[in-house]
Amino acid sequence: MPEEADRRALVWMNALSVSRPDYRIVHEEQLLAKRHAETSDFVSVVVEPRWPGGSSMEVYGRQDLSIHSLSDGFVESPYLRSWRVTDALQALRDKPNHAKIKAQTTALAKKLGGIEELRATIVVGFANPLTEEDVERISSRVPDVALLSPPRSDSRLPISWDYSGYCNARGFDDCNPDIRTSLTSGFRKWVSLLDSDDANALQSFDLNLSELRNSARQGLWYGAVYNAHIELVAELAADPRVSVILVGQVALGQ
């Protein structure tokens, strides 16, 4: 694939993922091979709602999409509708009601706790921004998504970073041990590869290069998303550093 198209895949696919923590870019080996057949005018992506359960589960709402080049470096990003996890992420901005929401979520999880193999997409907001090391002390469960900013203006979701399934799916060596075990380090690596020529493409995904660089420099987590058994809600809610917790979606899974 031409180097220019590689660059666009690096910027576009990650920008879509970073701007929409309610969805997951499906990083699969066959998709990487498919990318090599693309022209520099568009990049194919497979996107699915951030559904709870194992990676082998068939997810309702999975879509084959493409990101197209426009003039002046802008791109046409795919439309992704809001759904329950989107609403949970938006609720992070409702700080006056955090305690009430947390209590309601804890009560709901207690009722659902008796259902065997019930998994949930759990959205957490922290009372104050935390380092990744502090987040790891809250639970032994590793978060699936780091929320590296608060919810942004104009209903934009938090800046985020998640794990990819394959080493080169993001356009750089995501299996490098220096970054593989740290979502913060992975995000910082991506931001370090961006330059001013990417500004218009990033704007197409409601992202700002200065904003991304600031988040990378600070390296602080404002929240996290977990794909876990419903019982994790009680553990997370018990920590005073967690100001709000929501269950975005539940499903039976492994």
Task: Mark where each language-model region is.
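Loop-rich non-cytosolic ectodomains and luminal regions
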Residues: 1-225, 229, 234, 243-254
